[in-house]
């Protein structure tokens, strides 16, 4: 039997934290990862980020906003290619996630801004986008999708293992030798970022300094945790805007930040009750791993050492973009992206729309 073809894939991710666009290159056959290539990021300009925030929670696509966003992705690919001496022809496939503005799986609706056909024209390379739509259309949650990549990454690690991605929304992947279970745990950084932006004009709590000075308000925490989402068994997914920071309006900035950190970490900790067995190791990826208060509280609540994914040699800033490079190849090969135990679909299924340049 001939060896499987190894593809050079470039993945693009702009997450619910709204901080910018990540681009990463990997080489993969769609099953295993052969090598990691370059990674670059492009922060959103504050004015553009503000316009994206205004688009959150709406079902309408602004053609102008989508076009601008797509051009930004093309610019990042060009910057990465130039910096790392990568020829356009070296890239076999581009995985383009786009920017989620609305996610309502209960209504079989999910929307990611980003024009795949336009990106294919701008780059001259085939592009796969719209990764979540097929899953949602048949009643799946459409998220999380990265677990199939987490499983490939964790092949040589001691299992069972939990990989937590703390972006705007937090999700967890439970991986053992014969099981893959994944679901959103609750808010990640989104509420903390929204709080800091509303009260200070800054985009996040640098090094968790505000939360470190505050005290948790137990009544607000109880209020957050009483949400129906936490009563649901997995698989389940969460829209970035499912919760509102108005619950913390009466609190000082520091106490509100501490309460929101407690909310994120308590929700992640409670997720372990759904695992089929205890895990040997907790690894954290996403922006939340840079917040010392989140990492400290997570370790304390779990009663285990929680480490960033860099401790096992991965790049936590690149993983989400790498995941969509990996999924682009799987989509090309008609391999599954989602499973009954990750999104609730009735059977494993692929997804994504392929666009070729003219």
PLM regions: where:
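Short glycine-rich phosphate-binding loop at a beta-alpha junction
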Residues: 87-97, 277-288
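Glycine-rich phosphate-binding loop plus the immediately following alpha-helix
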Residues: 21-24, 36-54, 128-155, 162-231
């Amino acid at each position: 039997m001939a060896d499987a073809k190894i593809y050079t894939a470039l993945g693009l991710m702009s997450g619910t934290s709204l901080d910018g666009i990540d681009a990463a290159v990997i080489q993969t056959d769609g099953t295993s990862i052969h090598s990691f290539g370059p990674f670059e990021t492009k922060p959103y300009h504050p004015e553009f980020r503000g316009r994206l925030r205004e688009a959150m929670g709406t079902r309408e696509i602004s053609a102008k906003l989508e076009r601008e966003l797509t051009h930004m992705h093309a610019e990042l690919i060009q910057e990465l290619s130039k910096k790392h001496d990568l020829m356009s022809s070296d890239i076999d496939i581009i995985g383009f996630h786009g920017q989620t503005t609305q996610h309502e799986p209960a209504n079989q609706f999910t929307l990611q801004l980003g024009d795949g056909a336009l990106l294919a024209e701008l780059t001259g390379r085939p592009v796969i986008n719209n990764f979540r739509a097929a899953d949602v259309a048949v009643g799946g949650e459409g998220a999380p999708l990265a677990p199939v990549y987490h499983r490939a990454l964790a092949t040589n690690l001691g299992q069972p293992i939990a990989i937590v991605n703390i972006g705007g929304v937090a999700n967890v992947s439970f991986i053992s030798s014969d099981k893959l279970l994944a679901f959103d745990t609750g808010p990640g950084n989104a509420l903390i970022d929204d709080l800091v932006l509303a009260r200070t004009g800054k985009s996040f709590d640098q090094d968790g300094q505000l939360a470190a000075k505050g005290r948790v308000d137990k009544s607000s925490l109880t209020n957050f945790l009483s949400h129906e989402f936490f009563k649901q068994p997995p698989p389940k997914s969460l829209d970035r805007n499912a919760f509102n920071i108005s619950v913390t309006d009466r609190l000082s900035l520091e106490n509100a930040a501490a309460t929101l950190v407690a909310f994120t970490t308590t929700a992640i900790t409670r997720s372990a009750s759904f695992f089929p067995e205890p895990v040997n190791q907790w690894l954290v990826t996403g922006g939340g791993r840079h917040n010392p208060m989140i990492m400290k509280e997570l370790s304390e609540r779990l009663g285990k050492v929680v480490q960033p994914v860099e401790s096992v040699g991965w790049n936590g800033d690149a993983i989400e973009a790498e995941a969509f490079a990996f999924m682009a190849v799987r989509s090309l090969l008609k391999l599954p992206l989602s499973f009954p135990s990750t999104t609730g679909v009735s059977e494993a299924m692929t997804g994504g729309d392929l666009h070729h340049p003219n």
